[in-house]
Amino acid sequence: MKPDSLEHLVLQTESNGFRYYLSTDCPHSSDGVIADLVAGRVQPEIWFKQTRRRHIMSHDGLLIKLYQFHGFSDVRHSRRYASREVECYHDYLKAFGSMPGVRLPKLYGYFEKPFLGFLYRANGIIEEYIPDTRILGMEELSLVPPLFAHLYRKGIYHPDMQFQNVLWQPKTRTLVPIDYMGCNILFEPNWEALLMQLSWFLHAADVDDAHARPFMEEVLSLLPELRLDHEKAWSCIKALYEIPVETHQYHHPIFLPPELRRRTQPDD
């Protein structure tokens, strides 16, 4: 069943047991190419991932993520995948708004292959493919702090804010954040969420402290309203390096481990 928040997506077609809900500006929305790609009748221009459960492909301006579920244990958890991801995607785009030097891929659609009425044999999302992007290099790292400040002020929590999930398009000098699975809109700034996202980003970037700490300090300097002690904030980020991500990544509401919170919380 199409998520309630995606009322702007229209049931465009049904093919091979799949229902395709697409936006009016989705390329190939009416020529059958998307259904052919999902069914394997057309080979995509680029394969990014091809496993038993997950296919990620790009074709003519589209990025398609297909999740396939095998056996009942897979099927009963199927709602955690594309249906959840597409809702997160929609909420993220709506809350983020716009920002100079940052481009978010458009959300073009969602598709599903229902099973027993409320589960899925497969589902997936369709988004805009932004070409000529790559992983950030050290020389672009200094361009990212304003993005963190923007996420903080918009109350956006991105639990997979990894270094590899912020791409760089050299031709336009544009940052492209991707992969919004699990994103939550907190409706108000949250300093704990900010530090957790900084920790994951810097740890995944594998930069030394001589580059990582100035990065954090630049983010905090852009947020004068956030009265965090820089030494305490840095100590918190370093401590989070040692905690397995899954133990605190998806907590709702967002919070740090209690001892870290007590040691780090902003001055009144």
Regions found by a protein language model. Name each.
Residues 21-24, 35-90:
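ATP-binding glycine-rich loop module of kinase domains
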Residues 157, 169-268:
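C-lobe/activation-segment region of protein kinase-like
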Residues 153-163, 168:
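Catalytic-loop of the protein kinase fold
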Residues 131, 163, 182-183:
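Short, glycine/acidic-enriched loop or turn micro-motifs at the edges of active sites
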Residues 78-82, 86, 90-144:
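Conserved structural core of kinase catalytic domains
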Residues 58, 129, 167-169:
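Conserved hydrophobic "DFG−1" position in protein kinase catalytic cores
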Residues 146-147, 151:
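Conserved hydrophobic core/spine positions of the Hanks-type protein kinase catalytic domain
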Residues 1-46:
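Juxta-kinase regulatory segment immediately upstream of eukaryotic protein kinase catalytic domains
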